[in-house]
A protein has these predicted regions:
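Canonical positions in the second alpha-helix
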Residues: 31, 69-70, 101-102, 139-140, ...
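Hydrophobic face of amphipathic alpha-helices that form TPR/SEL1-like repeat modules
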Residues: 42-50, 81-88, 114-121, 151-159, ...
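Short helix-capping/linker turns of helical repeat alpha-solenoids
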Residues: 34-37, 49-51, 73-76, 105-108, ...
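Terminal, low-structured helical/coil segments at or just beyond the last alpha-helical repeat
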Residues: 176-196
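Sec-dependent N-terminal signal peptides
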Residues: 4-13
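Structural signature of tandem alpha-helical TPR/SEL1-like repeats
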Residues: 20-26, 54-66, 88-101, 125-136, ...
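N-terminal leader/linker segments that initiate helical-solenoid repeat arrays
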Residues: 16-51
Length: 196
């Protein structure tokens, strides 16, 4: 299960890379304990990265607890992280419910993206649902998350399930990804335009 989650976690982690480099764990713990929901989410992410590297179940539980504290305080990134934690616990239904709420109500792009990721191929115990995945990738893209745009570009570029390949649609999403700073989107634009 950890291998499936690794890609989602790395995208989730990118949102916090600066904080993780500039603050130590003790500082994050103190800030979380003082009520800073965003720092609780960063703390959860730091623990989750350690869990991915070590496989230590106690560290995973610390991660889930920090994410839950952040989520309980209304932090969307904390809720997105808690949704990933539910998958580790084997509860895809709870994960899907929380990620949907976090995406739809809190407008958290990482939650939208993760829903797309899990639905596209049925990762993490989710039911495969290409149209559902596209819906959530679209929401992530609309919220300014370049990877969501890239995924839509990829789906339209090659076609997926009952979605026909459409180079114009692919180009539209790749260009949006590129405008949002997505290197893969920029590379895809060059490939498509170079082929014309």
């Amino acid at each position: 299960m950890k291998k499936f989650l690794f890609a989602a976690v790395m995208l989730f982690s990118a949102a916090f890379a600066t904080d993780l480099q500039s603050e130590n764990l003790a500082s994050l713990k103190a800030q979380c304990q003082s009520g800073d929901a965003a720092k609780c989410a960063v703390l959860g992410d730091a623990y989750y990265e350690e869990y991915i590297a070590s496989g230590d179940e106690e560290v995973r539980k610390l991660s889930a607890a920090a994410f839950k504290e952040a989520c309980d305080k209304g932090d969307g990134e904390g809720c997105a992280g808690l949704g990933l934690s539910y998958i580790d616990e084997g509860d895809a239904a709870a994960s899907e419910k929380l990620l949907e709420k976090t995406c739809d109500e809190l407008k958290t792009a990482t939650a939208c993206y993760n829903l797309g990721f899990f639905k596209i191929d049925g990762h993490g115990g989710f039911r495969q649902d290409v149209k559902g995945a596209m819906k959530y990738y679209e929401k992530a893209c609309d919220l300014g998350y370049a990877a969501g745009c890239e995924e839509l570009g990829g789906i339209y570029n090659v076609g997926e399930a009952d979605v026909k390949a459409d180079e114009n649609q692919a180009l539209k999403y790749y260009e949006k990804s590129c405008a949002l700073g997505g290197k893969d989107g920029c590379d895809a634009v060059k490939l498509i335009k170079g082929g014309k």
